[in-house]
Amino acid sequence: MARTNFDMLLEAGCHFGHLKRKWNPAMAPYIFMERNGIHIIDLHKTVVKIDEAAEALKQIAKSGKKVLFVATKKQAKDIVAEKATAVNMPYVIERWPGGMLTNFPTIRKAVKKMTTIAKLMEDGTYGNLSKREILQISRQRAKLEKNLGSIADLTRLPSALFVVDVMKEHIAVKEANRLGIPVFAIVDTNSDPNNIDFMIPANDDAKDSIEVILNACCTAIAEGLEERKAERADEKAAKEQSEEAEEARPRARRARKSDDASKAPVAEEEAPAAEEEEAPAAE
């Protein structure tokens, strides 16, 4: 079953591309027509691409891996933050830190520094510093929190990148390509889809367009997380059942040995009685 349909995308304005003079020829297969100098995207193909991307994202989430969402353009920031947070995925909506992926250990150090400062503020050590030091640390923490707060839980490289505007986030796309990390992206008619593993041809400027696509993709991620949770619960139940069965076996063996031991004296008492009955016959 399709996660979106033609009417939903049409209502959200997903079909509006850029001016003809700004187009990228690589997007030609996804352009339906030109109207008033603006390219119109073929939404039937968009529906198919959304389903492909959503299924892949679902499998990534089901395997317990992370998808990093990237959207630093104004109209996409709040939507991405909301949707990514809802499915417990990391995101970048401020300036993309250069080397975020290719120099990940350095980024992790900055995140740890931010965590250390937070602990200083919580355990009371912060109060023993001078006003100047407190001001410097507060500013440093605010800067780190703004740029890296949303990736604080990202302890290793993400398994995929989801980008809203591939032209604006070209550095993030290049870093992901360099490391072989799959890239999912909303690609408009002015962008190059060649470096994108799962491209979704659609309007990447309108809020409604961005939201309807993110809804479909994040719903798929949520489904993957639920399936993973259910599988782990089943595995836990099976493990507990197996452990109970293992514990039951020694008890059953002990019970059998106890029964055998209680029957043995009875057999020995019957044996002499049988000999006494046979003795007169022998004389």
Language model regions located:
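Glycine-/small-residue-rich active-site loops that bind phosphorylated ligands and cofactors
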Residues: 75-76, 168, 205
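Short glycine/threonine-rich loop/turn motifs
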Residues: 171-234
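N-terminal cationic and glycine-rich segments that engage phosphates or anionic surfaces
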Residues: 1-66, 72-73, 77-120, 131-134, ...
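Long, charge-patterned amphipathic alpha-helical coiled-coil/hairpin "stalk" segments used as oligomerization
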Residues: 87, 92-194, 202
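Intrinsically disordered, low-complexity Ser/Pro/Thr-rich segments
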Residues: 254-262
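Residue-level signature of catalytic and energy-coupling elements of molecular machines
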Residues: 13, 69, 161, 213
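Short His-Asn-centered micro-motif
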Residues: 70-73, 163-165
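D/E-rich low-complexity acidic segments and tails
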Residues: 241-246, 261-283
